[in-house]
């Protein structure tokens, strides 16, 4: 699979970058659309999305570089070449989350409400962004056979793309992309439930993505390691536990209080 979309000599455009940008655009558009329901000004949400993306990319790259330091210790310039791959999504989630918490606290906005609004855009962005790994021939699973891939009824271009230097590999990028897509669809319906409470959509995201990533990570051959443990699996366990705690805490009390869709009590948020 050719990772380069366009090579004009003076500029090279990688498929990885295109898929990441496409995921950011679609995810960001959904966040902006949902924020309008809550009377959140475009200036506020644009600034929030911009800062979260910046810090999210920094965090995702930082986690990858830290656990792959031997690869960059003698090639510091390579650290900034994110278009070649090497973004650890968990690092991006953590730094992006911290950015949102600080930003919302600064402007005295309900942090939980903002997190609930953004997770739908985040998970569909992840579903799309994973295809960047496909074009980079990375984030794949163990070696397999052509017959196995054909039994999955995959499109021909995916099967051909999983033939890397003469060996077929399991498309774990696709497993995660589909998992995120299913989570996206569930979230769309879940947060429209009458009794859905503030904080529950983000709790569902933590649980759903954590479970999927934990098992999919076990198949990957390029996991970042901390001793004998896969970093992504450790963080996924943390996400699942955190999500369960949030879900339980937010479920307490009257079903009619602190509802996500209680727009009547929403005050306009301006930057």
Where do the language-model regions lie?
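A feature for loop-to-transmembrane-helix boundaries and adjacent hydrophobic helices
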Residues: 1-271
């Amino acid at each position: 699979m050719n990772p380069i979309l366009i090579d004009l000599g003076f500029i090279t455009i990688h498929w990885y970058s295109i898929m990441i940008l496409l995921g950011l655009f679609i995810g960001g558009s959904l966040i902006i659309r949902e924020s309008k329901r809550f009377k959140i000004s475009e200036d506020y949400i644009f600034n929030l999305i911009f800062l979260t993306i910046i810090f999210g990319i920094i965090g995702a790259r930082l986690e990858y570089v830290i656990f792959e330091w031997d690869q960059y210790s003698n090639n510091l310039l390579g650290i900034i070449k994110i278009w070649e791959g090497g973004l650890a999504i968990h690092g991006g989630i953590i730094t992006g989350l911290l950015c949102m918490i600080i930003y919302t606290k600064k402007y005295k906005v309900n942090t939980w409400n903002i997190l609930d609004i953004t997770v739908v855009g985040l998970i569909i962005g992840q579903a799309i962004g994973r295809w960047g790994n496909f074009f980079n021939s990375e984030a794949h699973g163990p070696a397999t056979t052509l017959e196995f891939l054909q039994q999955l009824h995959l499109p021909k271009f995916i099967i051909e793309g999983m033939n890397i230097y003469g060996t077929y590999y399991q498309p774990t990028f696709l497993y995660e992309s589909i998992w995120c897509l299913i989570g996206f669809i569930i979230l769309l319906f879940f947060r429209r439930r009458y009794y859905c409470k503030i904080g529950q959509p983000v709790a569902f995201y933590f649980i759903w993505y954590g479970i999927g990533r934990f098992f999919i990570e076990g198949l990957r051959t390029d996991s970042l390691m901390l001793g004998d443990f896969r970093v992504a699996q450790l963080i996924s366990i943390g996400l699942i536990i955190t999500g369960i705690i949030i879900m339980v805490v937010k479920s307490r009390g009257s079903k009619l209080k602190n509802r996500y869709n209680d727009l009547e009590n929403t005050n306009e948020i301006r930057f």
